[in-house]
């Protein structure tokens, strides 16, 4: 295997060598060679870049690999140039090949930078071997795996969990989502369209963001839409959840309304002869609390189900594009799901649910994620048929990746970053500044992680 890999690489560089023979006729291929042999780019060589360069060169001019010009027909200048090229290549390979006598026939790792971690490439290679099945099977398997760590994490998180520590996970989630969009999804859309970004892909990104916006807005409307007679004024010191947190203007209006209700209630109590108003008000408050709690729980479950469906769709679509992109999308979804599941845990525990009940509800939402993976598999499989329906699915298939990118952008900028903008008054100014610096570090860390995946 090792000899075959070397033969492939030497053949590639011999193809680069032939670009000097044909002069201006193969000027573009010569640019590939010069770019490839520059020290800055040589430090970024891996199997993917080698295969890409090989494909570009052969597509540029297939005759590069089948030239009839022999070594005797080359001029002294051409031979000198070839020697320098091969000398540079061999020197680079000698300095970067791993020294391992037992597994040298299977290991071929070239560092991206001088101080690059070889173990990271080994981990990536190991993960890719786990997804050696068909694209559809890989997508369903990855979707299932993304649901396991968050549920395990739920069991380990104590009920009194510091929200500032939770926001560190949220920051990693934000960085990973942006990394998946800008380092994986959008470059793939660009490359699959021949170095172009068609208007249909741009609108698909917009549609993806709008779908998540409509879902988010609809849930907010449904949560706050209840009979005004059932509205319950908050007690002093009672905290408001992030889901039902009103804006500043609405808070002022609510305060005035509550004061008016209090004055009216005092007047009613003075004029009444019995305790009937107190009893009625107590019943109304209990009904209001039960109605609001059930609404929050059910709508949160609905939101999670749709979100997991879109995650399954995105992961499987990425695997049908490329295994490496599928793995990076899986990591992005996984890093986002952990803080999201903790947030769901907080909502459900606050409404009286036990951890075991929370896990049952999360299993229900996991099924919707698997359903999304199955739908994506069906779309990509059926699109290969020559029927009009298959043609429609083929067009839909091309829009799934940019649609996913738009959804991830909405989640990152309007779903995740606003949580990081919240100020924790108990930490003080210095504490909030320190946590802000930590958020920046974790965002960059999450983004950089997707660069190496």
Swiss-Prot record:
One of its GO terms (cellular component) is endoplasmic reticulum membrane. Residues 229-278 are annotated as: Disordered. This is Uncharacterized zinc transporter P8A3.03. Residues 159-165, 216-358, 421-432 are cytoplasmic. Keywords: Endoplasmic reticulum, Membrane, Signal, Transmembrane, Transmembrane helix. The keyword Signal applies. GO terms for molecular function: zinc ion transmembrane transporter activity. Residues 240-254 have a biased composition (Polar residues). The chain crosses the membrane at residues 138-158, 166-186, 195-215, 359-379, 400-420, 433-453. GO terms for biological process: intracellular zinc ion homeostasis; zinc ion transmembrane transport. Belongs to the ZIP transporter (TC 2.A.5) family. KE4/Catsup subfamily. SUPFAM superfamilies: MFS general substrate transporter (SSF103473). InterPro entries: MFS_trans_sf (IPR036259), ZIP (IPR003689). It is found in: Endoplasmic reticulum membrane. Residues 1-23 form the signal peptide. It is a multi-pass membrane protein. Residues 24-137, 187-194, 380-399 are lumenal. Residues 229-238, 256-278 have a biased composition (Basic and acidic residues).
């Amino acid at each position: 295997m090792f000899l075959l890999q070397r033969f492939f690489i030497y053949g590639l560089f011999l193809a680069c060598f032939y670009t000097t023979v044909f002069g201006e006729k193969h000027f573009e291929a010569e640019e590939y060679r010069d770019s490839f042999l520059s020290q800055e780019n040589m430090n970024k060589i891996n199997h993917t870049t080698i295969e890409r360069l090989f494909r570009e060169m052969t597509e540029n001019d297939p005759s590069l690999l089948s030239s009839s010009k022999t070594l005797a027909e080359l001029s002294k200048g051409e031979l000198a140039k070839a020697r320098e090229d091969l000398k540079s290549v061999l020197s680079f390979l000698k300095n970067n090949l791993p020294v391992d006598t037992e597994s040298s026939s299977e290991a071929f790792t070239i560092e991206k930078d001088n101080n690059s971690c070889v173990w990271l490439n080994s981990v990536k290679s190991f993960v890719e071997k786990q997804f050696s099945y068909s694209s559809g099977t890989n997508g369903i398997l990855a979707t299932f795996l993304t649901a396991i760590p968050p549920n395990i994490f739920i069991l380990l998180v104590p009920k009194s969990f510091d929200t500032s520590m939770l926001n560190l996970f949220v920051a990693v989630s934000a960085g990973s989502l942006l990394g998946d969009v800008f380092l994986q999804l959008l470059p793939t859309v660009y490359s699959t369209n021949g170095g172009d970004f068609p208007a249909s892909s741009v609108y698909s990104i917009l549609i993806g963001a709008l779908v998540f916006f409509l879902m988010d807005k609809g849930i907010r409307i449904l949560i706050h839409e209840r009979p005004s007679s059932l509205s319950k004024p908050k007690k002093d010191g009672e905290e408001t959840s992030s889901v039902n947190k009103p804006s500043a203007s609405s808070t002022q209006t609510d305060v005035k309304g509550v004061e008016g209700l209090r004055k009216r209630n005092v007047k009613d109590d003075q004029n009444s002869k019995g305790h009937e108003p107190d009893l009625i008000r107590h019943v109304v408050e209990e009904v209001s609390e039960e109605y609001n709690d059930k609404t929050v729980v059910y709508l949160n479950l609905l939101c999670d189900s749709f979100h997991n469906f879109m995650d399954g769709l995105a992961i499987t679509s990425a695997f049908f594009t490329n295994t490496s992109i599928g793995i990076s999308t899986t990591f992005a979804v996984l890093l986002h799901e952990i803080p999201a599941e903790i947030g769901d845990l907080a909502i459900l525990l606050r409404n009286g649910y036990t951890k075991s009940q929370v896990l049952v509800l999360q299993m229900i939402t996991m099924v919707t994620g698997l359903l999304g993976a199955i739908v994506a598999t069906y779309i990509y499989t059926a699109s290969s048929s020559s029927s009009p329906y298959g043609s429609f699915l083929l067009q839909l298939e091309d829009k799934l990746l940019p649609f996913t990118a738009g959804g991830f952008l909405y989640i990152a900028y309007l779903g995740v970053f606003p949580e990081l903008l919240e100020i924790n008054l108990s930490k003080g100014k210095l504490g909030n500044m320190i946590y802000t610096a930590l958020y920046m570090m974790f965002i960059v860390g999450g983004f950089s992680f997707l660069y190496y995946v």
